[in-house]
Swiss-Prot record:
Protein name, entry field: Myosin regulatory light chain LC-2, mantle muscle
Miscellaneous remark of the record: This chain binds calcium.
Ranges for domain EF-hand: 13-48, 82-117
Function: In molluscan muscle, calcium regulation is associated with myosin rather than with actin. Muscle myosin contains two types of light chains: the catalytic light chain, essential for ATPase activity, and the regulatory light chain, a calcium-binding protein responsible for Ca(2+) dependent binding and Ca(2+) dependent Mg-ATPase activity.
Length: 153
C-alpha cells in the first residue's frame, strides 16, 4: 500500500512565499514547472545544470509539478526551517565568494528582472533599509534587521 503524503502545517507567510517561489520558477506561466522552466530559472542564476540533474529534480514528483505538488515537495522542507535561515540561504545563492555580500548593482538587476520584477519605487523602498557598504549589500545584516522587525510585530 502506498503511504499517504504527510500533511504539513504551513503558516500563511510560508504559503505565500512558496506561491511566489513557484510563480518565479514557472517562467512560461502555464501552472506547471517543467524542464524548460528549470533551465530558464537556473540560467538566470548563472548556472545551467545538465539535463540528467534537472530530470532527477523533476522525478521527485510523480506526475506534473503543479503548485499542489510543489507545496507537497517543498512544504516539508520549509515547515521545519527558520525563516531567517531560509532568507540567508536564498541570498547566499547570489553570493559568489561566500563573504556575506552581494554587489549592489547585481542585486538591483535581479530585483528588476527576475520573478515578480520590482518597480523602481519598490527597489527604492527596499534600499532605504539596506545595509550597504562600498556598493556591497550585506545580506546577513539585512536578515538580522528583518528578524528583529518581525519579532516586534
Amino acid at each position: 500500500a502506498e503511504e499517504a503524503p504527510r500533511r504539513v502545517k504551513l503558516s500563511q507567510r510560508q504559503m505565500q512565499e512558496l506561491k511566489e517561489a513557484f510563480t518565479m520558477i514557472d517562467q512560461d506561466r502555464d501552472g506547471f514547472i517543467g524542464m524548460e522552466d528549470l533551465k530558464d530559472m537556473f540560467s538566470s542564476l548563472g548556472r545551467v545544470p545538465p539535463d540528467d540533474e534537472l530530470n532527477a529534480m523533476l522525478k521527485e514528483c510523480p506526475g506534473q509539478l503543479n503548485f499542489t505538488a510543489f507545496l507537497t515537495l517543498f512544504g516539508e522542507k520549509v515547515s521545519g526551517t527558520d525563516p531567517e535561515d531560509a532568507l540567508r540561504n536564498a541570498f547566499s545563492m547570489f553570493d559568489e565568494d561566500g563573504q556575506g555580500f552581494i554587489p549592489e548593482d547585481y542585486l538591483k538587476d535581479l530585483l528588476e528582472n527576475m520573478g515578480d520584477n520590482f518597480s523602481k519605487e519598490e527597489i527604492k523602498n527596499v534600499w532605504k533599509d539596506a545595509p550597504l557598504k562600498n556598493k556591497q549589500f550585506n545580506y546577513n545584516k539585512m536578515v538580522d534587521i528583518k528578524g528583529k522587525a518581525e519579532d516586534e510585530d
